[in-house]
Amino acid sequence: EAYSLLNNPTGREAISTLIKQMEDNKSKFILILAGYENEMRELIQSNPGFLSRIKEYFYFQSYSVEELTQMFEEMAKEIGFTISPGAKNAFSDLVYSLKDGYHFGNARTVRNILEKSKDRHSLNFKKGIVKNRFELDERDICYEEIRI
């Protein structure tokens, strides 16, 4: 995320260098910055050089719960797992509750949920709670937020 450049002196120096390159090489220099909208706005406003030189902005909408659920199923399939209907519903409910949170990371969050759920599934399988070795069910779906 480009806005992480604001957090230290080296990053601020990099920002100054980028702005100089944008001015000195404007006909042959393309700068692409990416990150969350609010933090990017803070980055752009941190230096008048950005405000006067950046002319194009692209905004991407977050994925819908349905799209994230499909992504979850596809990621699980890639590692040899299927998703029971109950697990699919549990995942959708979980994502719905997390989706508007500040640190929700779309595909990154989906991957983290899958990894935690797979770990829980292994324990549930060992304990005999679930019977199918390669099918996640609703008891497997879990997510623990990182507390800062």
Predicted regions and their residues:
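Flexible beta-alpha connector loops of hexameric P-loop NTPases
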Residues: 2-12, 57-59
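Conserved C-terminal "switch" segment of AAA+ ATPases
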Residues: 42-45, 60-103, 122-129
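Conserved C-terminal helix/linker of AAA+ ATPases
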Residues: 37, 86-89, 107-108, 114, ...
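Substrate-engagement module of ASCE P-loop NTPases
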Residues: 14-29, 75
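Catalytic acidic motif of RecA-like/P-loop NTPases
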Residues: 1-6, 19, 23
